[in-house]
Amino acid sequence: MDEMDDFFGNDELDREPSPFGEEAIEDNTGEEGSRRIIEPKLLRTKKLTNPRLALNEKTLTGPKGITALREAFQNFNPNPKDDPYKNLEKMMKKYAYWGHLMFPKMKTEDVLNRVETLGTRRQVKLYIMKQRLGESTDDVENEKRETKSKNGIIDDGADDDEDDLFNDLPEKETPTKPINHTEKVVDSPEKKNGQVSNNDAEEEEYRMMEEERLREEQEAREAEAEDELMEDFDLNNDW
């Protein structure tokens, strides 16, 4: 018996450690002498590597949406003498090609049904009305101008020069002569004005950083809203 104890006595020490460390649980509820290790389940975190494409108002009013459809039918002139079904087939091929370029993952009939649903939305109606009136439909530029106008910045359409932005930053002062503390130092008006301009440059830089942060938060909220809209659409439609 002692020999058997010596043989199996160090079984617990010789067993390889579990890859889960101390989280492994030993189950002794079974028969005597039988042991099994219950490993905890790994929590699989869903990592979003690429943003999911969504067929929504933004896509339909973008460069691959209604604008591309108008360009596709710009030179389309059906022959009235031909068979009407042939003309219809040519037209549907253009619709199918346009739908594939805009959203390749969906079938043509599903794309057309989705476009019909989106056509009742206010953003799409406003976009079509602006196109008919010949007004600007560049939503990206309009959003940028609205954001800058809300923050009190007037956008004249000119690009900012990076060199000018860096020139506005305060320069590092290098002392050339040791200051005698016994002498009374009097700041000149030019030096005071330079300090005021440096403070203005720092405030301007901080304001630009704050605007960038707000813009990124707005884009994140819009992307989240688009994902929720697409999830609702997937749940309400059987593909």
Curated annotation (Swiss-Prot):
Residues 169-193, 206-223 have a biased composition (Basic and acidic residues). This is Protein TIPIN homolog. It comes from Caenorhabditis briggsae. Keywords: Cell cycle, Cell division, Cytoplasm, DNA damage, Mitosis, Nucleus. One of its GO terms (cellular component) is replication fork protection complex. One of its GO terms (molecular function) is DNA binding. The keyword ATP-binding does not apply. Belongs to the CSM3 family. One of its GO terms (biological process) is DNA replication checkpoint signaling. Pfam families: Swi3. It is found in: Cytoplasm; Nucleus. Residues 1-14, 156-166, 224-239 have a biased composition (Acidic residues). Residues 1-38, 135-239 are annotated as: Disordered. The gene is tipn-1. Required for normal progression of S-phase. Important for cell survival after DNA damage or replication stress.
